[in-house]
A protein has these predicted regions:
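Catalytic-loop motifs flanking and including active-site residues across diverse enzymes
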Residues: 86, 90, 180, 245
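Glycine-rich phosphate-binding loop plus the immediately following alpha-helix
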Residues: 76-121
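Short, contiguous, pocket-lining structural segments
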Residues: 9-17, 61-63, 82-86
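Gly/Thr-rich phosphate-binding beta-strand-loop-beta motif of the actin/hexokinase/Hsp70
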Residues: 51-78
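Contiguous, well-ordered alpha-helical segments that form the cores/surfaces of helical PPI scaffolds
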Residues: 42-46, 68, 92, 96
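Short acidic (Asp/Glu) and glycine-rich catalytic loops that position anionic groups and cofactors
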Residues: 70-75, 86-91, 160-165, 227-229
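A short acidic Gly-Thr/Ser loop motif
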Residues: 59-67, 84-87, 207-210
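Nucleotide/phosphate-binding catalytic cleft detector across ATP-hydrolyzing
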Residues: 1-56, 104, 119-122, 128-178, ...
Length: 260
């Protein structure tokens, strides 16, 4: 990355302030509101609903604004850390580096971050970014011919830029390395026993950015150097990596209710 610059900062939350917010919300909606607990603890509770997952367990919560890590030991103790910079920062770096149109920069950069690329070489085939070729029975839209496009669930989406496929791919991957990979390693090192990632056996990825098609693979290759296994969580065996904290909040509430 040569031109992109971004700044992210974490804001410390005060328990008393959160209590006041809960009280104000309770007065506004007329429903009892209580603090559910620390986000990292809730994320681990939710992640434990993934089939085959058990403690000791480390969780990487890759969201939009922060990269969070938590480690639960066999005796139930939880260590956590929150670092600024995650999905939104990656999108910002992609937008700035590629100088994408300002009228649709956020959505386009977000799509580039999430989807693989291809080059439309004819009306019946495209060359994917991994150099494989996909053929089509029906002709593609002539407006796509010669364009770099995103391979999405709804079809091919052309990118309004003069940059080559190789350039876009490199910018996307470098932004993810600078933000996700670097922050993930920093976070895991701070929660790992003795500050050594080698002491973590298994890591589960949760959060919206866990849906990304290549982040888990990038992390897998890097953590293999430490002998650490990493995989994407499947919350409640059906939700994938999302809703870990929400699931943990519900489970935590049920546990507190049962103890009353």
């Amino acid at each position: 990355l040569e031109n992109a610059v971004g700044l992210a900062a974490m804001v410390n939350t005060d328990h008393l302030l959160m209590e006041r917010l809960a009280q104000a919300l309770e007065r506004e909606i007329g429903v009892r509101v209580e603090l559910g607990g620390v986000e990292a603890n809730m994320a681990i509770l939710g992640t434990l609903t993934t089939p085959g997952v058990a403690v000791p367990l480390a969780v990487l919560d890759l969201g939009a604004g922060s990269t969070d890590a938590a480690l639960m030991t066999s005796d139930g103790r939880v260590t956590s850390i929150h670092l600024a910079g995650a999905g939104n920062m990656v999108s910002l770096l992609i937008q700035r580096e590629l100088n994408l149109p300002s009228d649709a920069n956020v959505d386009l950069a977000e799509m580039i971050k999430r989807h693989p690329l291809c080059k439309v070489e004819s009306l019946f085939h495209v060359r994917n970014e991994d150099n494989s070729v996909t053929f089509f029975k029906e002709p593609l839209d002539p407006k796509l011919f010669g364009r770099v496009a995103l391979v999405t669930e709804t079809g091919l989406t052309p990118i309004a830029t003069e940059h080559t496929l190789e350039r876009i791919r490199e910018v996307r991957r470098e932004a993810k390395r600078r933000v996700f990979l670097r922050n993930a390693l920093r976070a895991l090192q701070q929660v790992a026993p003795l500050g050594n990632i080698r002491n973590i056996d298994f890591v589960a990825i949760v959060g919206g950015s866990g849906l990304d098609f290549e982040i888990s693979q990038m992390l897998m290759h890097k953590l293999a150097e430490f002998g650490t296994v990493i995989g994407t969580a499947n919350i409640q065996a059906r939700l994938g990596p999302i809703n870990a904290v929400a699931t943990g909040l519900v489970l935590g509430y049920l546990q507190r209710t049962a103890q009353r």
